[in-house]
Amino acid sequence: MSAILDAISTALYSYILIILLIGVGLYFFIRTKALPLRMFGESIRVVMEKPEKGSDFSSFRALMVSTASRVGVGNIAGVATAIALGGAGAVFWMWVIATVGAASAFIESTLAQIYKHRSPHGHSFGGPAYYIKDALRSKTLAIIFAVALIVTYMGGFNLLASFNVNQAFSAYSWYNASYTPYIIGGLLGLAMAGSIFGGTRRLSDITGILVPIMAIIYLAVGIVVIALNWRNIPAMFESIFASAFDFKAIFSGFAGSAVMLGIKRGLYSNEAGVGSAPNAAASASVSHPVKQGLVQMLSVFIDTMVICTITAFVILSSNIEITGDLKGAPLVQNAMATTIGSFAGPFTTFALLLFGFTTLVGNFYYAEVNLRFLFGDKPTPHWVLTIFRAVASLLVFAGALLEFSVAWNIGDILMGLMALINLPVIVILGNKAIRCAKDYQMQRKQGLNPSFRASTIGITQKLDYWQD
């Protein structure tokens, strides 16, 4: 099974997704005139705005939910795996994917805001399934995407998050492969159940507290480790760029190259263009759709350019030998141990627990939004939600028992299939988001707090929001 999954993953990323991801990202980067760079400062301003009157789901809350999913085990275990298998050059290609991918993230999240729906309780919700159905008018494709997202996030990604949390404990002497994974999986499953049975409001409360705390603590310790290894920093950068452009090594073994691993782990970590973050973006109450496009663009930068980069620099500045035998969380633990000693193990484990748990919670939010889509205008039966949440908790338990290659390949394949649907869709619908961006920039130049009406960009169909 492991060999089959590996072959599928390699084919998917070698021949299809690498072209789509970079191609679509570059297309939107150029079409928006480098918007991720031009409007970076504006994205920081927008995220601090209060929600629109009558709503309590702010841009900051939406940022925390999407960042909870983006900022997870991929920022530690994923980056370490990419470096262990693809070399230091994988870091450079993660940066590339984040820069061009931020443009895709802007487009998909702006579209999610334009086509968001209003619940009977007055809350907004939406995502790719909704803009596929409403803008493309393809209910069949929308259902396929919703099912793909549920399987990917509640299944593949949460299996992988649980696996990586379990891996963080494997370095301890008391760890026993025969029964410890069952204990860790069981505890994670119970914690997951306690969170998700409280509903999406509780999820946003949990992530709004945990995400900033875990990110700040991890960054602070990472910066200390890098500072203590300052003598190795010049060699570290030399290694990153030399490995990134070693084309002989790249094309002689593309499946395990820096490019491939950088793209895989970069996509797994920042999710730009995959179609996940728009589900959080649609929930925010803002005066203009572009505001959430900017916020989700910022989330990509926080994830890759800040947190993933800190992990990479911790590993590469430590000057430990990277052979490929040691990968994932144990590699980060060994790198940190060169400067902070025995504190490295408990700290990395604690970080992975927080990163992993918020990933589980954020992923489930996306899955539940798409489950509700499958029931259309009808309320999702309570018994269905109960079974759905119970299955999600059981899958978290099962993830701790998986093998390394099986866990990562399942996540990569399912994520790739989602991107194969969402990327062509946002190319088709992208002009609407680009016109929306021009409308926003024009109002900002006039000194206004931008507001939006769908008719100003040529949308005449009936929407739940943005009507005259």
Describe these PLM feature segments.
Residues M1-V73, I83-A90, G101, V427-D468:
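N-terminal alpha-helical transmembrane segments of multi-pass membrane transport
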Residues I19-G23, A142-L149, S173-G198, I217, ...:
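Transmembrane alpha-helical segments of multi-pass small-molecule transport proteins
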Residues L20-Y27, R31, L35-I44, L149, ...:
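Membrane-interface loop-to-helix entry segments
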Residues K53-L85, L111-A129, K133, I150, ...:
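Alpha-helical membrane segments and immediately flanking helix-loop junctions
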Residues F29, I107-K116, P120, V221-S239, ...:
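Extracellular/periplasmic helix-exit of transmembrane alpha-helices
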Residues L17, R31-P36, N75-V79, A88, ...:
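Transmembrane helix-loop junctions in multi-pass membrane proteins
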Residues L85, M94-A98, A102-A135, K139-Y175, ...:
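Hydrophobic transmembrane alpha-helices that form the core helical bundles
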Residues A34-S59, T81-I83, G87-A88, A103-L136, ...:
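Flexible loop linkers connecting adjacent transmembrane helices
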